[in-house]
């Protein structure tokens, strides 16, 4: 970082320029073109060079090497697919499970039409959208936690 020149408020000429709104042109260092054309690209290229250098000099494994002859007991998807996986795992009819998954975006598309006359931005003045959001969040968290548990405890989360 460089040191910028501050205005001298004891100087009457500087005070007159600042009073007219002209002071910003006469002190300091402008951001254009110095910072944006010269300093920022060097910082960005230096960061990329450091990351590339570390990747070449110290490569790290992404995960355990795959063993095609040993499969895990239970295959789990990535964490962001847990609620969908739980729906498919607990619903006995697979077509019903797929329809339940498709109903989530369809239900979210109907929320703006339920409150189309309500123009408030405050969530407390839009009760339908707030309720749908809160219930959807609780259900998604419930399903996500349940997907990580065994099937017999997945719906109750082992609490009941």
Swiss-Prot record:
List, alphabetically, the InterPro entries matched. Cyt_b/b6_C (IPR005798), Cyt_b/b6_C_sf (IPR036150), Cyt_b6/f_cplx_suIV (IPR005870), Cytochrome_b_C_euk/bac (IPR048260)
- Which subcellular locations apply to this protein? Plastid, Chloroplast thylakoid membrane
Q: Which family does it belong to?
A: Belongs to the cytochrome b family. PetD subfamily.
Q: What is this protein called?
A: Cytochrome b6-f complex subunit 4
Q: Which gene encodes it?
A: petD
| Keyword Transport (UniProt) | yes
Whether Manganese counts among this entry's keywords is no
Q: Which PROSITE patterns match?
A: CYTB_CTER (PS51003)
Q: Provide the Gene Ontology terms for cellular component.
A: chloroplast thylakoid membrane; mitochondrion
Report the transmembrane regions from the record. 36-56, 95-115, 131-151
Organism expressing this protein natively: Psilotum nudum
Name a GO molecular-function annotation: ubiquinol-cytochrome-c reductase activity
What the protein does comes down to: Component of the cytochrome b6-f complex, which mediates electron transfer between photosystem II (PSII) and photosystem I (PSI), cyclic electron flow around PSI, and state transitions.
Record's bilayer topology term? Multi-pass membrane protein
């Amino acid at each position: 970082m460089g040191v910028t020149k501050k205005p001298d408020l004891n100087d009457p000429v500087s005070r007159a320029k600042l009073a007219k709104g002209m002071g910003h042109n006469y002190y300091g260092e402008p951001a254009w073109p110095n910072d944006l054309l010269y300093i920022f690209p060097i910082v960005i290229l230096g960061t990329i060079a450091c990351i590339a250098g570390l990747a070449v000099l110290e490569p790290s494994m992404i995960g355990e090497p795959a063993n095609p002859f040993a499969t895990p007991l239970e295959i789990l998807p990535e964490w962001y697919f847990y609620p969908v996986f739980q729906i498919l795992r607990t619903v006995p009819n697979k077509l019903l499970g797929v329809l339940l998954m498709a109903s989530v975006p369809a239900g979210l598309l109907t929320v703006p039409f339920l409150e189309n006359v309500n123009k408030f931005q405050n969530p407390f003045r839009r009760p339908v959208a707030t309720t749908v959001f809160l219930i959807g969040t609780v259900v998604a968290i419930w399903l996500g936690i349940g997907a990580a548990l065994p099937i017999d405890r997945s719906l109750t989360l082992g609490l009941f």
